[in-house]
Regions:
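Bacterial Sec-dependent N-terminal signal peptides
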Residues: 1-21
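Glycan-recognition and catalytic cores of secretory/periplasmic carbohydrate-active enzymes
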Residues: 20-266
């Protein structure tokens, strides 16, 4: 009896040690999940129809314009032509990538690759790795590179949240690679990240923190993802430089200093 108890104890101890070393959370790839007839499937189909109803050339217009190319259609209105131009294009890449992973729909696949090819054309036209739709982008980023920074909550050098805006492009390219397996998106993402390293390499940490007073979305997360994708630690350093100490340092100390902060900062 004692021998049996001893062996059982060893088995339980080994099982516990294995459980403690195992990942605490595991994810199902979207490709492995299929929805049955349900409100969830109805919602997915509604989303699918909306995604395909959008005109890709209108979403691409700001990116082509800023690259000095002729848009194939006028851009959308409201936020897409009043200063936040191009931000929906980044969201659109993410939506297409996830929808393709979830459904395998060929129309979604073709739409995603049309977007990526056109954006790549714009990226090549600029020649620095940059892709973006903020009006006056090239002048803006040259000012930032020169250390001329005028930052406020929704403003950076007179432009409407350009960091937040370009984060959507970064995230969209990342998702096109991770969810849809696009090697083109991976290279475009790396080139765009290398461009940001060039823009910010001459800025001090103080200048970086000053710039981050402007709404900047989750750029640090995306740069950390690029480090994971490539295995190159220079992108992890970029992620560190884009981490806003005003918000994060108090949290590290278990202090709540979030009152009055804008959620899209992080």
């Amino acid at each position: 009896m004692k021998t049996t108890s001893f062996i059982l104890g060893l088995v339980l101890s080994a099982s516990l040690a294995k459980a403690q070393n195992a990942p605490q959370v595991s994810y199902f790839p979207l490709q492995n999940v299929k929805l049955l007839d349900s409100p969830f499937l109805q919602a997915q189909q509604t989303d699918l129809h909306y995604i395909l109803a959008l005109n890709p050339d209108r979403l691409l217009a700001p990116f082509l314009r800023e690259a000095g190319l002729q848009p194939k259609a006028p851009g959308y209105t409201n936020w897409e032509n009043t200063g936040l131009d191009g931000h929906i294009g980044g969201h659109y890449l993410s939506a297409l990538s996830m929808m393709y992973a979830a459904t395998g729909d060929t129309a979604v696949y073709n739409r995603l690759h049309y977007m990526l090819n056109e954006l790549h054309h714009a990226q090549q036209a600029v020649g620095t790795g940059f892709i973006g739709g903020t009006p006056g982008s090239l002048q803006l980023w040259e000012e930032i590179k020169a250390g001329k920074i005028r930052a406020g909550g929704f403003d950076l050098n007179g432009k409407w949240v350009p960091l937040y805006n370009i984060h959507k492009t970064y995230a969209g390219l990342r998702d096109a690679y991770l969810y849809a397996g696009s090697d083109l998106a991976r290279q475009m993402l790396i080139d765009l990240t290398d461009w940001m390293i060039d823009i910010t390499s001459g800025l001090s940490d103080e200048q970086m923190q000053d710039m981050l007073r402007s709404e900047h979305g989750g750029l640090n997360e995306t740069f950390a993802d690029v480090a994971e994708i490539t295995g190159d630690k220079k992108y992890l350093e970029l992620a560190r430089r884009f981490s806003h100490k005003l918000i994060l340092d108090p949290l590290i100390k278990d202090e709540d200093k979030l009152t009055g902060m804008h959620a899209n900062t992080q």
